[in-house]
């Protein structure tokens, strides 16, 4: 390959990459404008005038949607799960129960909100096998084609009959 071929190939490759980036950005912008709810030409002009004058006739805080947090959690569809409506916007400190931001996977919980209290208390762990009690009665179906074999009986794995408490 000559130097000219390398330069031309590199230029074509850079152009293709830039065109792909521009196409993705245009697609994202198109999705943003197409999926924007409740805004048509007249509303957009009114909002631009309000922004210029610093006035707002209607509040910009979105209304509470009872199904939004359940959709983010993967627990629901687009229909509200409860019939009660939320009287407050979602951003206030005293949140409503139907659209609580505390249920979403994107909310970072502080130490006082964690069930363990932020690691201040000890959690106990009880082994599944006790010397005096034997194995617990779990009714599990064994695979029929592939039997499970263990290299040892497993009794030496759990020898402590007491609950084990560790720092979390």
Swiss-Prot record:
Source organism, top-level taxon? Eukaryota
The record's InterPro entries line, in alphabetical order, gives: FAM163, FAM163A
For the keyword Electron transport, the answer is no
Print the keywords alphabetically: Membrane, Transmembrane, Transmembrane helix
Instruction: Keyword check for Nucleus, yes or no.
Output: no
Task: List where in the cell it is found.
Answer: Membrane
Which parts of the chain span the membrane according to its record?
6-26
Q: How is this protein annotated for GO cellular component?
A: membrane
Q: How is this protein situated with respect to the membrane?
A: Single-pass membrane protein
Q: What is its main location?
A: membrane
What family is reported? Belongs to the FAM163 family.
Q: Which PANTHER family match?
A: PROTEIN FAM163A
Please report the name of this protein according to its UniProt entry.
Protein FAM163A
State the organism named in the record.
Mus musculus (Mouse)
- Gene behind this protein: Fam163a
């Amino acid at each position: 390959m000559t130097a000219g071929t390398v330069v031309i190939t590199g230029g074509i490759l850079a152009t293709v990459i830039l065109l792909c980036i521009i196409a993705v950005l245009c697609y994202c912008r198109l999705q943003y404008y197409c999926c924007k709810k409740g805004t048509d030409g007249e509303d957009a002009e009114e909002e631009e005038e309000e922004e210029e004058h610093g006035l707002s006739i209607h509040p910009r805080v979105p209304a509470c949607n009872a199904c939004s947090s359940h959709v983010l959690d993967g627990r629901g569809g687009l229909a509200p799960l409860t019939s009660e409506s939320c009287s407050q916007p979602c951003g206030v400190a005293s949140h409503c129960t139907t659209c609580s931001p505390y249920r979403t996977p994107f909310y970072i919980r502080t130490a006082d909100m964690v069930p363990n209290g932020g690691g201040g208390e000890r959690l106990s762990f009880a082994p599944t096998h006790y010397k005096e009690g034997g194995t617990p009665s779990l009714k599990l179906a064994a695979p029929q084609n592939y039997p499970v074999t263990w290299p040892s009986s497993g009794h030496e794995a759990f020898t402590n009959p007491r609950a084990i408490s560790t720092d979390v």
